[in-house]
């Protein structure tokens, strides 16, 4: 029986059990404690580093330098809760509009609706697959003309680990004085122009779900610009309890804190994060070499040296001329017990958001129709990646009925 190859499974480095055991030994099993504090400090230290690695040097160690921002990290129960708290801290409410990247997972957009606000979706550009700066500016101008006020925030996503075009996006946001929320849930360790993703915007968001670059079993973090903002996030994450000897509440709060046990997993994971990033990037190099001679399969790679993706998920596009659809490839690989996944269905095409304003150019819809996510996690070996690439290439060849490579 063949061993299944999964998309992206969690990988334990060994230190996790030590931190968990310390939590049990000291009875710190609540959503605060030494592991929570330590995990936040570990993340903040990492986010002040930068990586200058390119695809061709993917197996080398991380290079470090001082980040442009000093991050203040608050560990939370999920990436979604972090996005929600960013909305709360920006005082987003009913009647407001928030611009959101359309090509993303639903969690990027859902918290906008939690606040009673309206998402306004902006399509992608083809280089990074992330928010189009041109459409972003068009959307801002059009919403101001139609509503008489500017959008309250901009949610930019670094999809599949690929950094967005932050220089252009930040210039637009600064010009209109609109805060940016960076959804870096998939981009821990990715950098743009040497700066860690998640540290450009007013707030950044990370996810530690079981399939992310590191996991806490389920968790997330909000990256804040100041100590005061972090304390405000913590206040709302702990039911907005006021500083009284009894329980008094003057604001609506939430139960969004991360447990000390889960944070212990995170601390152990931080010890192997550089290796995880290097492994994902090394797999990208293998896929790139394998598909280089295949004219109808394109691996999504860094557009230029300013971009350094962690390649959380390696993704490919199948040319319409290939006469072989992504679904056919996915089904063929599934028969070999190899897990793949379609690219995200854009939010402006989701039934739940059918009435939301959107500014589109067809890019994200084309990506959705032509793309596929390939196994990329720490348990995927170099030989696995070579096998997967070979199976895909052979499928395309067989469909054509000739050897055109």
Please provide the spans of the model-predicted regions.
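Hydrophobic/aromatic ligand-binding patch that stacks against planar heteroaromatic rings
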Residues: 110-112, 172, 261
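N-terminal "arm"/small-domain region of PLP-dependent enzymes with the aminotransferase-like
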Residues: 1-30, 34, 375
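Conserved coil-to-alpha-helix start sites within the AMP-binding
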Residues: 104-109
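Structured binding elements
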Residues: 116
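Phosphate-binding glycine-rich loop
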Residues: 32-97, 111-113, 121-123, 146, ...
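PLP-dependent aminotransferase class I/II
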Residues: 10, 34-42, 46-50, 68-71, ...
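Active-site phosphate-binding strand-loop segment of PLP-dependent enzymes
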Residues: 127-216, 221-223, 228
């Amino acid at each position: 029986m063949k061993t299944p190859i999964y998309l992206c499974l969690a990988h334990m480095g060994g230190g996790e059990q030590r931190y968990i055991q310390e939590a049990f030994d000291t009875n710190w099993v609540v959503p605060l404690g030494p592991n929570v504090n330590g995990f936040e400090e570990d993340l903040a230290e990492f986010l002040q580093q930068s990586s200058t690695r390119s695809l061709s040097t993917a197996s080398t160690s991380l290079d470090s330098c001082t980040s442009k921002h000093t991050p203040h990290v608050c560990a939370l129960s999920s990436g979604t809760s972090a996005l929600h708290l960013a909305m709360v801290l920006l005082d987003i409410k009913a009647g407001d509009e928030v611009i959101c990247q359309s090509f993303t997972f639903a969690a990027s957009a859902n918290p906008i609706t939690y606040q009673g606000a309206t998402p306004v979706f902006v399509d992608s550009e083809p280089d990074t697959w992330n928010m189009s700066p041109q459409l972003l500016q068009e959307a801002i101008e059009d919403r101001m003309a139609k509503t008489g006020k500017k959008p309250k925030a901009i949610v930019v996503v670094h999809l599949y680990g690929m950094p967005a075009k932050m220089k252009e996006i930040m210039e637009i946001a600064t010009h209109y004085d609109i805060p940016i929320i960076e959804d870096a849930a998939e981009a821990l360790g990715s950098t743009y122009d040497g700066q860690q993703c998640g540290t450009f915007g007013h707030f950044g968001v990370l996810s530690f779900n079981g399939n992310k670059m590191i996991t806490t079993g389920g968790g997330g973090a909000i990256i804040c610009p100041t100590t005061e903002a972090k304390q405000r996030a913590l206040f709302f994450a702990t039911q907005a309890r006021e500083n009284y000897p009894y329980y008094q509440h003057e604001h609506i709060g939430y139960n969004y804190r991360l447990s000390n046990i889960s944070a212990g997993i995170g601390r152990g994971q931080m010890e192997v994060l550089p290796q995880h990033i290097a492994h994902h990037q090394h797999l990208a190099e293998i896929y790139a070499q394998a598909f280089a001679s295949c004219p109808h399969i394109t691996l999504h790679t860094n557009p230029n040296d300013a971009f350094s993706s962690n390649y959380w998920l390696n993704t490919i596009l199948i040319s319409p001329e290939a006469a072989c659809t992504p679904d056919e490839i996915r089904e063929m690989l599934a028969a070999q017990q190899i897990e793949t996944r379609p690219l995200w269905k854009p939010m402006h095409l989701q039934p739940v958001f059918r009435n939301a304003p959107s500014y589109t150019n067809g890019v994200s819809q084309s990506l959705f129709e032509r793309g596929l996510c390939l196994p990329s996690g720490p348990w995927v070996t170099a030989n696995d990646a070579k096998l997967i690439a070979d199976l895909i290439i052979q499928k395309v060849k067989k469909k054509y009925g000739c050897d055109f490579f």
